[in-house]
Amino acid sequence: MKEKIGWIDNLRAVACLMVIMIHTTTWYVTNSKAVGEHTWDVSNLLNSASRVCVPLFFMISGFLFFGERSAQGRHFLRIVLCLAFYSLVGLAYITWLTPISEAISIKHLLQKPVFYHLWFFFAIIPIYMLSPLIQVKAVRAGYLAVVTLVLAVLANPNTIDQSVGPFHWLPLNLYLSGDSFYYVLYALFGRAIGMMNTDRRGISWLAGVVFFASVAGIAMGTKKQMAINGAFADTWYLYCGPVVFIAAVSLLVLFKNCLNRPLPVLTLISRNSLPIYGFHALFIHFMRTHHLDHTDQPFIDIPLVFVITLMGSLLLALGLRRIDKRHLVS
């Protein structure tokens, strides 16, 4: 069990870092006309490599709660308290440090998160609610491969339309709709892969190759789609998209096989990942909107914004943990 917790902690920490990287590079990928092509390519690559972060969070939750152990009342309480607490933090930030109307944020509180990154707390609630009903069985790798091919690729509503003349053949219509189905599927895969013996000869290399190929596919697909549309399009960035799904599965296998021992820095980030997630967007938004960044020097700006955001969020997280002795929101 310690081995399993080791790779889970490392994976959670890297997913947390990826979230920060996505929001750090978003300005560049959505403002292609304001940045050079080389800068946009690098930002797009970093963003593409980080798109698996949200799927990984769902997979981790599935691994933890879709087995013998299910989410308990204290887990539901913690999610609700986190949503309330970080919404209040976001509301305070909006009120005091932005011209955004807090009244609108309050009015739509149950339909739209106060701050954009808090949507995840809403999305994870159904996973927790379903967990007492689900206990994933051990399955073969071949079965998961078929499920991935059919549900995550061929019948995925986010798969780009393909036709031969008047004959439309992709995506298949299996009446799948909505992101929530794929969030549950990620959780199911997290548990299934977590129980599977994946440490076989060549599997880790294959997982690594598939992950890097998927990242390249996301990056190149995004650039091609931007050329077609004449503006940035997130078609290939979607968390429930087929290539992101494959990338997330391959990275999970890679971490499970190769990073199953505790690493001090990643352990620290993992332990504080919840408040880091809750605070990080405020740092990035403040720097971007108060001209404290250096977008004219992107290769200084990106690592600087990333490090300041990580360190600032980590310091707040450590401070919050000293106050929140029961770790209800930290």
Task: Report residues per predicted region.
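Membrane-interface helix-boundary motifs at transmembrane edges
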Residues: 2-5, 66-77, 130-143, 192-206, ...
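Kinked, hydrophobic transmembrane alpha-helices enriched for aromatic residues
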Residues: 3-36, 59-62, 78-98, 123, ...
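Juxtamembrane loop-transmembrane helix junctions in multi-pass integral membrane proteins
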Residues: 3-6, 24, 38-45, 71, ...
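Interfacial loop-to-helix transition and helix-capping segments at the boundaries
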Residues: 42-53, 107-123, 160-186, 219-249, ...
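Hydrophobic alpha-helical segments with transmembrane-like composition
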Residues: 57-59, 64-66, 93-195
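Alpha-helical transmembrane segments and terminal signal-anchor/GPI-anchor hydrophobic tails
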Residues: 198-267, 272, 298-300
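C-terminal "closing" transmembrane helix and its immediate cytosolic amphipathic cap
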Residues: 256-270, 281-330
